[in-house]
Structure formats: C-alpha cells, structure tokens
C-alpha cells in the first residue's frame, strides 16, 4: 500500500509566514489598501430629449434611458440608499437635432442642462458630473468638429468642447468630464472656466487615458453615438499604447485637470497604476464601461460566475491598482450590497 511522503526540510523562515495576517475576516479588511464605499461610486445616467421616455437598453442589463419627466422618480430611491454622484450623458432622439458642430450639446432646453437644473433642485447634496463630448450631438457621430476630408479639426473642436463645458458649469454642474480625447482641450476648458469666473467651483475630470477598443458597444446603443463613418482610432488611444497613455496623463495633469479617468478599466490596470504614479496628487477614476458590465452579466447568466462576487472582485481590483473613484453601472446594486 502506498503511503504519502513528507520531505525532511528546514524549518520555515519567519518572513515566509503570511497567513497569520489574514486568517480572520477583520484582518482581511485591514489588509485591503482601499475598501469599496458608496461615496466612491458614480452612476451614469442617460437623459433623452423625449420627456416621458423610460426605455430599457437591451445590451445594458437593468439600465434605462430616461426623459426629464421620469428622472426624479428613478434617482430618488438611489439617493435615499446613499447615491452621492451621477454622470450625465445627453441623448438627442428628436429628428433634426444633430448637426456637424453638435449645437444641441449645450442647448438650454436640451436634456443635459435641464437635468442639471432639475437634479440640483431636487437633490441638493447630489454631486453632478457632466460628460463633455460632441459625439451624441453631431450628425457624423464623431467627437469633434471635422474638416471637409473627415479628419478632426483640433482648433474648432476644442473651442466648441470648451464652450459646452463652460455652459454646463454655468447651468450648475459641479464637475465637467471631457471624454473626446482631442489634444489640448483641458487647457482650453480650464481657461474658459477661469474667464467665466467658475474655475474655483468646477472640477475638471479628464478622460486622460481613454482607449479605442471593443467594449463600448452597449454605451453607443444607449447614447446613439456610433460614428456614421470611420472610427475613433485617430484620437482615442491605441490599445497597446502605454507610452502614449503616460504622455496623455502627464499632459492633462499639466494642463490643469483636477482628476483623471482611465477607460476602460479591467484590461488597463497597468495604466491605472501608471496614472496613480504620474498623477499621484490627483484622484484617479476607473470607468467600468458598458462592455465590461455586460460581459459580467453574460457570464453570470451562464452560471460561470456569481454576479455579486465578480462585481466586487473587479471593482476592488480598480482600487488596488490606484483608483479612488469608479464610474459603474453596478452602482444601484452596490448601494444595496454595501448596505447589507
């Protein structure tokens, strides 16, 4: 009969024993550099120009697109559960709204500016972030103003984007988050806010490291923002471009960004760590994008993972990599999970 062998080995070194440091649930909490809290979460809201809309997004489980008349009833229970911040994305659906320069982006009667004012009135403690981009509002679906040959006109684009950011701040947004990835827009936004007397009370949260990739499909379904021709590879970062990302992080920090977003997040934890080092004095925000969210739901539906466990694992990974904030479609679930 075979018997188990045990090697005769030297006694274990003192420095090799780690398990005594995490054998108890409280110890495991103490060993966590950052623990997920409600005040770290930012919830994306899609606001359309159809006032009574409440349309589920098929590719984004549990997420809807809302008109202004449906917004308060949806947000109120989330605020009561501890929601502290939202990021607004406007979705113009009415015929004839879009044009080559995204005029509707900062229309005072448009969905975003209406939503800013409504949410500030109904929920004074809720922190309002506005995504700043033109893609939802341009007839061509690109993030800036184009030359006749279809390439980005940098100067006109950043001038337009800065104007939109300033108008959101004038309407009451606490924070503007430019997501266009067009060179130099942080500097122009900051200058615009200074000129408007708003820089002292408007946080500029830059999508400094936003990569071109395959994980934005459900968002584009929700925001109706797919390009009508071409793609965004000439202004969003290439997936393997770590050096470019590091340069973009340093640039936006130097241009006056108050915080940094890394997007997507799961496949870019190295960039998040880079951001926490290059921009060490700024809050780093992970954007858990629509495709990442949808993938976790799909895996859970197949029985491959437990949804709650994998959501926590992914988000705790962002914190471990250096994030302090997370834009997450899981925010409503986390508000319940973190309460229980």
UniProtKB/Swiss-Prot annotation:
Which InterPro entries does the record cross-reference, listed alphabetically? ALAD, ALAD_AS, Aldolase_TIM
Which reaction is catalysed here? 2 5-aminolevulinate = porphobilinogen + 2 H2O + H(+)
For this protein, the record's SMART domains field holds: ALAD
Give residues annotated as binding 5-aminolevulinate 2: 290, 329
Its domain of life? Answer: Eukaryota
Q: List the disulfide bonds.
A: none
Q: How does it assemble?
A: Homooctamer.
Protein name as annotated: Delta-aminolevulinic acid dehydratase
Q: Name the gene that codes for it.
A: HEM2
């Amino acid at each position: 009969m075979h018997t188990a062998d045990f090697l005769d080995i030297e006694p274990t070194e003192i420095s090799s024993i780690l398990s005594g440091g995490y054998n108890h649930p409280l110890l495991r909490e103490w060993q966590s550099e950052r623990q997920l809290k409600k005040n770290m979460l930012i919830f994306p809201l899609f606001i359309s120009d159809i006032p009574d809309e409440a349309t589920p997004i098929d590719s984004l489980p549990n997420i809807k697109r809302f008109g202004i008349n449906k917004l308060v009833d949806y947000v109120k229970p989330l605020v009561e559960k501890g929601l502290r911040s939202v990021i607004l994305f406007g979705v113009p659906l009415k015929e004839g709204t879009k044009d080559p320069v995204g005029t509707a982006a900062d229309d005072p009667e448009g969905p975003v500016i209406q939503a800013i004012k409504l949410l500030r009135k109904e929920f004074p403690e809720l922190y309002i972030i506005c995504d700043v981009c033109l893609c939802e509002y341009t007839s061509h679906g690109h993030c800036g103003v184009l030359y006749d040959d279809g390439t980005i006109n940098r100067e006109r684009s950043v001038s337009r984007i800065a104007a939109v950011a300033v108008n959101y701040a004038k309407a009451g947004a606490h924070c503007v988050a430019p997501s266009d990835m067009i060179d130099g827009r942080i500097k122009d936004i900051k200058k615009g806010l200074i000129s408007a007397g708003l820089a002292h009370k408007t946080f500029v949260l830059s999508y400094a490291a936003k990569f071109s990739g395959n994980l934005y499909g459900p968002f584009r379904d929700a925001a109706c923002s797919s390009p009508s021709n071409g793609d965004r590879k000439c202004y969003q970062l290439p997936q393997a471009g770590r050096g470019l990302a590091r340069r973009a992080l340093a640039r936006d920090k130097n241009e006056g960004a108050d915080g940094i977003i890394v997007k997507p997040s799961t496949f870019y934890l190295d960039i998040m760590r880079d951001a926490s080092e290059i921009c060490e004095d700024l809050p780093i925000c992970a954007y858990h994008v629509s495709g990442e969210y949808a993938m976790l739901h799909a895996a859970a539906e197949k029985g491959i993972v437990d949804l709650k466990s994998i959501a926590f694992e992914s988000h705790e990974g962002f914190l471990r990599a250096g994030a302090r904030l997370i834009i997450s479609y899981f925010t409503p679930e986390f508000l319940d999970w973190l309460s229980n």
